[in-house]
Amino acid sequence: VTGVQTCALPISRDAVPLTAEWAVKVREAIGSGPTLGIDWHHRLSIPETVSFVNRMPRGTLDYLEEPIRAESPAAYAQLRTLIDVPLAIGEEFSSKWAFAPFIEQGLTDLVRVDVCNVGGLTEAMKVAAMAESRYLDLMPHHPLGPICGAATAHLCLAAPNVSAMEIRRSPTEDLGFYDERLFPVQPRQEGPRLFV
């Protein structure tokens, strides 16, 4: 597999078996090397999440991102006892305080900090330090344009516990942020600062 390819999946709950089948086929096609995760974006219940995971052989997914709403650490604690797939949580959290129970209680494996949502690089670095103290990696969320991308890249270079940075430049998701006709001045690195 060269590059990243995306696939739009149905968003109804009937998609659980279809998505599990698709994930198994993708894993078979790409082998065990590349990381494979599914982001349900809070669309499932706890029983649906368990059903989804149980439809796949162990090791199909490297992580499962936010299958249920993240307002309730207790719900994630329950889910944690029912599945063995690593969880990625936090892309919508707006402060270190929202991350604290998920990190302190071991409810997430990959911390999905979003520099823009969490309030900037200083707060993101505090989340990174909290995660590092529990031997957790960051997988920063980056859904926005080039300025957010540059800030997220700075976070990834500054934090010692980053596993991957999300970059969304696929044809199905490109919102025009990188179109040089619309944004002729693109972010670039010039020394140790963010320059746009």
Q: How should each PLM-predicted stretch be described?
A:
Residues 2-9:
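Short, small-residue-biased leader/transition segments that mark boundaries at the very start
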Residues 10-14, 61-67:
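Glycine/Thr-rich beta-alpha phosphate-binding loop at enzyme active sites
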Residues 14-28, 44-57, 75-80, 98-104:
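Distinct, well-ordered alpha-helical segments
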Residues 34:
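Glycine-centered, small-residue-biased loops immediately flanking beta-strands
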Residues 54, 60-63, 71-195:
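Shared catalytic-loop signature of beta/alpha-barrel
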